[in-house]
Amino acid sequence: NLSSLLKSPMPIPRRARRAFLSSLRFLCWAKVRRAGFSGKFNPTPVPVLFSNKLVRQGLETLYCSKRINIVKIQSDLKSGNLVLSKELLIVQQKLVSKQNQVNN
């Protein structure tokens, strides 16, 4: 869960983080569009830092991971804050359960 990730964050280089967040934003919007989600977003800012290991694992792995329930709407690249939406978190959890059904 997010709290355990936040307790022991490993900072990553700014350039890598910028590219990573940009890719993550694109990936999540694409997934949400495929899920047929539409509606207003009420984002809540949550500070998140990614470790180098998570970045190397790839965007798909990160997004579909049960351990990190994260959905990306906007990014504040200067502070490294991610903006999460409760509505999209629900959509993301549905996508993960679909993904698990496909894998099993």
From Swiss-Prot:
The lineage of its organism: Eukaryota, Fungi, Dikarya, Ascomycota, Pezizomycotina. It comes from Claviceps purpurea. One of its GO terms (cellular component) is mitochondrion. Keywords: Mitochondrion, Plasmid. It comes from the Eukaryota. It is found in: Mitochondrion. This is Uncharacterized 11.8 kDa protein.
